[in-house]
């Protein structure tokens, strides 16, 4: 067995753009023959995948599944809506979710490692960067899920609720985007930040500080209600809050998770005409 030196790994990395571990693995399998390693990487799609790795994958799908007292929610990204609807991409996302459920996996890095070879092969086949972005698990007595198309997925856990109520609550979370379950769950950091913003606004109106502070107290109560599930008007019956609805059913929400495709990912806007012009100058 030939020695796989750091300089050899570095050279292969520079020539292919692939990751260090992928290069080391390819060289080991090729017994230190760099040309054979490159040929094998081309065949496996590893080089193509490495070139696509820098592309922003902000489209994709959300998948949910409930198994017993555990709910699973997964986001897998690609670059375009077209690929998000592709059968091969959808099947890959389903397979990843099934593996998470079967193994009770809540660590996305474990899933990434498990499916890296399949991901690389799919990138080579489809021609877009693909990323297993995140996985979350929710435990509860009664679980419900809702999917708004493939782009928004919600899990809700509750006590004392039936499946229909939990499904309606999941639909509400999808539409109203609460950040917390109850107003008292809003973190001190979030409250303080909003308080300072509202106080600055009130002070700019020329009111004395004492009056401005009283105004802000009322606004803060409204704010914590707006960002919490139980404080929001129920989307299917806005005359009552979600908190009132739960009280009527003698039920309680213990947690929820809401995923939306691409949230938090900065999408690069491309000027197609400029891109074509740039490519023509290079050729």
Swiss-Prot record:
GO terms for molecular function: translation elongation factor activity. Keywords: Cytoplasm, Elongation factor, Protein biosynthesis. The keyword Cytoplasm applies. InterPro entries: EF-Ts_dimer_sf, Transl_elong_EFTs/EF1B, Transl_elong_EFTs/EF1B_dimer, Transl_elong_Ts_CS, UBA-like_sf. Residues 80-83 are annotated as: Involved in Mg(2+) ion dislocation from EF-Tu. The keyword Protein biosynthesis applies. GO terms for cellular component: cytoplasm. PROSITE patterns: EF_TS_1, EF_TS_2. It is found in: Cytoplasm. NCBIfam families: tsf. Belongs to the EF-Ts family. Associates with the EF-Tu.GDP complex and induces the exchange of GDP to GTP. It remains bound to the aminoacyl-tRNA.EF-Tu.GTP complex up to the GTP hydrolysis stage on the ribosome. This is Elongation factor Ts. The gene is tsf.
